[in-house]
């Protein structure tokens, strides 16, 4: 059975949680392979809203194995809070249903502090980070001073690693007139949480390989979107990890995954949280309508999302960087009330024309979209579950997106509930 990868093709918030939840019915295990608790997934099941940030969406399904790979920046306190919150909903996780990679770098209080300090220092050039410490945690990982989950097993060696970590972080704190953090503070932070997270620690790569050899279906759940990828996104307004499908092998520690079915998700329009270029952004009535109908507020941060028309140029490039074999269009119903719908087919910048997204930020900031206008359908698609439920103009719109992006659309999401999904090629 082929592995399934679900990734975003925009700036995140494409509805990956809902699609992973829907696909996980036929999967045996779901793995998060990058990001941290700065990314949120919302799933509506039987009228109840579940908001997840670290845990794979499969925790909402019975008898599914959920795993977190080493590519994830793991905030142990955030993880425990999330596990505890699910208990209130009658969902109980144990080491047989949730596995954490031994190599996960841990997000600590000093990382959140560093995130806030650096964002403050950027002033008007701020990136719009969530200040949850994800970026500084990844910096420490690359700098070979991160505390990893497996380090919690031995307090003696852990103390030496904490000293190394603080020798770096206290430099920043001294330079910005902040109080230095003592090793005992970090040791207390870690030793208190260790008994709650260590029971979940398992050799995740070995488990994944074993499942694949048994012919089981493993689903890999991405966070954020390709346009936020540290290498392929709208740098520097990006996240601190690789969000494209190719990172699955690195973030899980398994090189031989066999055939991969890559589903790239995109909203029927575009949204973005935080700062950065956004060529198709709409700040008037259209953007307001998308915001209100789409309820475009961040799951984790409650920040308002910027809204605009579908950008086929950037989505095509994102599909290319992730090797998307299928596309999933979400929130089609948000466009139900719009008379004419625009799609960006190329960019202009001065005398130049671009059919791709240039890497240079000074060009990205000046790009002007060239639009193609398509007729709306002015009919409700909310809750549609079959292709025949969709108006002709809605089907034509989806077909045009397929042509422009160059990837077939296999699923269309038409509402918040987990069953509001239209298979386009049943």
UniProtKB/Swiss-Prot annotation:
GO BP field: 'de novo' AMP biosynthetic process; IMP metabolic process
Positions bound to GTP: 12-18, 40-42, 305, 331-333, 413-415
Record pathway: Purine metabolism; AMP biosynthesis via de novo pathway; AMP from IMP: step 1/2
Entry's EC annotation: 6.3.4.4
Protein name as catalogued: Adenylosuccinate synthetase
Pfam families: Adenylsucc_synt
Subunit-level organization: Homodimer.
InterPro entries on file: Adenylosuccin_syn_GTP-bd (IPR018220), Adenylosuccin_syn_Lys_AS (IPR033128), Adenylosuccinate_synth_dom1 (IPR042109), Adenylosuccinate_synth_dom2 (IPR042110), Adenylosuccinate_synth_dom3 (IPR042111), Adenylosuccinate_synthetase (IPR001114), P-loop_NTPase (IPR027417)
Function, in words: Plays an important role in the de novo pathway of purine nucleotide biosynthesis. Catalyzes the first committed step in the biosynthesis of AMP from IMP.
Enzyme class: ligase
Name of the encoding gene: purA
Residues annotated to bind Mg(2+): 13, 40
Keyword Ligase: yes
Annotated positions binding IMP: 13-16, 38-41, 130, 144, 224, 239, 303
Species the sequence originates in: Anaplasma marginale (strain St. Maries)
Family: Belongs to the adenylosuccinate synthetase family.
UniProt-annotated location(s): Cytoplasm
Main location: cytoplasm
